[in-house]
Amino acid sequence: MSLFVTFEGPEGSGKSTQARLLYESLYARRYPVILTREPGGTRIGDLIRRIVLDLQHTEMAPTTETLLFSAARAQLVSEVIRPYLEQGGIVLCDRYADSTYAYQGYGLGRDLAELRTITAAATGGLRPDITFYLDISAEDGLERKRRKHPGARLMGQRGVDQEWNRLDARELEYHQRVEAGYRALIAQDPERWRVLDARQSIEALAEQIAAIVEPYLASIPQLEAVPYS
């Protein structure tokens, strides 16, 4: 048996922190676990990440953006996710295909049927067992992220902090469409999603996530020793 867990949410939701904390907990308990992210997680994926998130690439067409994210995903599934799952391990992924539906589909207005076709090709139909959604409004999430990067501005303005990426910098209305898109996705597949209030403390969220994952661990054998990182 294996386990595939993904983390989704608007900007500033804290999903990356929670993915890392779950990874550290499972690793310490000697479970075979890896943590990866989208876009990225492979040499090719990291190169794509630099291109697709670069603030200077304001001329990028929506189709280009969609295909770049999907190319990074295809490489990640082929090189990292599927092989590790086939070995019976646990894969934690910071964003996955749902981000494409939310950000490029609902956010940019790309045709959802077309996105499903592209995603099926990129993933080979691989779906998560659990998807955690860290729930926070677009407004509150962006404010959180701006507090971390005080030089941040909206798209097209000067003086943007380099850690504030091209998608972060889009107008509030875009992020509101993304948030609404996530809610539509959750309604379509409620059994897979676990919705958690991202306004809680980091510790409270980590405890809830660990409790949800725990029953799935019964079928996954622990390693005899903690592997080298």
Curated annotation (Swiss-Prot):
Q: Which GO terms describe its molecular function?
A: ATP binding; dTMP kinase activity
Sorted alphabetically, which keywords does the UniProt record give?
ATP-binding, Kinase, Nucleotide biosynthesis, Nucleotide-binding, Transferase
UniProt-listed SUPFAM superfamilies: P-loop containing nucleoside triphosphate hydrolases
Query: From the record, what ranges are coiled-coil?
Result: none
Q: What's the domain of life for this entry?
A: Bacteria
Tell me which InterPro entries the record gives: P-loop_NTPase, Thymidylate_kin-like_dom, Thymidylate_kin_CS, Thymidylate_kinase
Q: Name one GO biological process term.
A: dUDP biosynthetic process
EC code? 2.7.4.9
GO cellular component labels: cytosol
Which family would the database say this protein is a member of? Belongs to the thymidylate kinase family.
HAMAP family tied to this protein: Thymidylate_kinase (MF_00165)
State what protein this is by name: Thymidylate kinase
Source species: Roseiflexus castenholzii (strain DSM 13941 / HLO8)
The gene designation is tmk
